[in-house]
From Swiss-Prot:
Belongs to the RRF family. It comes from Lactobacillus delbrueckii subsp. bulgaricus (strain ATCC BAA-365 / Lb-18). One of its GO terms (molecular function) is ribosomal large subunit binding. The keyword Cytoplasm applies. The gene is frr. It is found in: Cytoplasm. This is Ribosome-recycling factor. Responsible for the release of ribosomes from messenger RNA at the termination of protein biosynthesis. May increase the efficiency of translation by recycling ribosomes from one round of translation to another. It comes from the Bacteria.
């Protein structure tokens, strides 16, 4: 018997991994990457708007991001949003475009970023464990309500644990790869 609880747990764990993956993409590794700006929100006519919807982002050089606003009047708003973000980058505004120079990472900064990757990984693993906990509760309820037998419950609990272990392993692997990328620069 294939249980809907298992399928739902797999979907939710995969969503947690996808969120972690998108968060990892915004972690700076010393090279220009447009996804660094994915979480930057610009106050535009009183409405928080994602920067990526307000400007074209190009990479003219390996360590330079160039932001060309669709509306030139939003240039200062974009500059303020970048300064207010947690990117730690200083925008250079020439009146037409904003340039972000991605500095070389120092050894100390690389270690800080590697720790941040670890924190993000731990948050993702907590999300996976929460999904596991919900699935286990649902299985216990199904057994209590007579929908599944006690043996089926045990078998399905093992399956949930297997999916949890696989998800956790995948998160650890992604974190290790990102740490290597950061440390090696």
């Amino acid at each position: 018997m294939n249980n809907e609880t298992i399928a739902k747990a797999k979907r939710n764990m995969n969503k947690s991994i996808e969120v972690y993956q998108s968060n990892l993409a915004t972690v700076r590794a010393g090279v220009a990457n447009a996804s660094l700006l994915d979480r930057v929100m610009v106050e535009y006519y009183g409405v928080p708007t994602p920067l990526v919807q307000m400007a074209g982002i190009t990479i003219p050089e390996p360590r330079v991001l160039m932001i060309t606003p669709y509306d030139k009047s939003s240039l200062n708003d974009i500059e303020h949003a970048i300064l207010a973000s947690d990117l730690g980058l200083t925008p250079a505004n020439d009146g037409n475009v904003i340039r972000l120079i991605i500095p070389q990472l120092t050894g100390e900064r690389r270690q800080e970023i590697a720790k941040e990757v670890g924190k993000l990984a731990e948050e993702a693993k907590i999300a996976v464990r929460n999904v596991r906990q919900e699935a286990m509760k649902a299985l216990k309820k199904q057994e209590k309500d007579g929908e599944i037998t006690e043996d089926e419950e045990r078998r399905l609990e093992k399956e949930v644990q297997k999916v949890t272990d696989e998800s956790t392993k995948k998160i650890d692997q992604m974190a290790d790869n990102k740490r290597k990328e950061i440390i090696q620069g």
